Amino acid sequence: MFQKVRKQRFEHREKIQGKYINILEGHELHTDVFSESEQRGIVDYVFYLRDLGRAGRLRKRTYSEPQKWMRGKRRITIQCGCCYNFTYDNEGNPPGIIRHDEMALIPTIIKRMIQKMVLWHVLSANCVPNSCIINIYEKGDCIPPHIDHHDFLRPSSTISFISECNILFGSDLQTIGPGEFRGSAEIPLPLGSVLVLKGNGADLVRHCIPGVPRRRVSITFRKMDDSKAPFGYRPDPDLEGLRPLEL
């Protein structure tokens, strides 16, 4: 049960605007949240969605796969609950949630992940996620340095599957090559773990995933700011009224 979950907090101080600040303040790593059998079921479903996307059976913005592979440039994404841009798109839409697009609903197996994380005291019942992005990485794929858009509330959370990697943080993250970055602090992401991002680590410094050494899947959950949600969005009743188990 949830008593087996271990929570770890982090500290790494950097001088920012003349003050030494813990840039990892707010981050929590919860290990042993999802069992090996749960991980297998989730990963199988992720690749089922990938196959649907490749067959053209998912909406255009829901499924995205770069046509040409280049180290540090390729990553398959599947978005549910909302779709958002990382940068300006070809239609001139700015970074953030695209409000006029019809969104794909969060699948049942993914909703069960959210329910479990709230029940097990990993996520707060006051900020239940209502969107997610699935990332499928092949060897060398990465996520460049960024701060999550403020169309989404804090905290966000990310879960790791298939292979482990590190997430890198820093007030001065540097790109030193395709998929290669230099920062001042890193946090390991064990399989089946949940990293909760909030506080200084979510808003004050950037983070990134350097080029991964082997195939990996991650699922990142976020709660939309109500004022930024897609037009016509309706709360999912399966994610309403969730409460943690009593300790």
Protein language model regions, located:
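Non-heme Fe(II) oxygenase metal-center motifs and adjacent flexible, charged/small-residue loops
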Residues: M1-L247
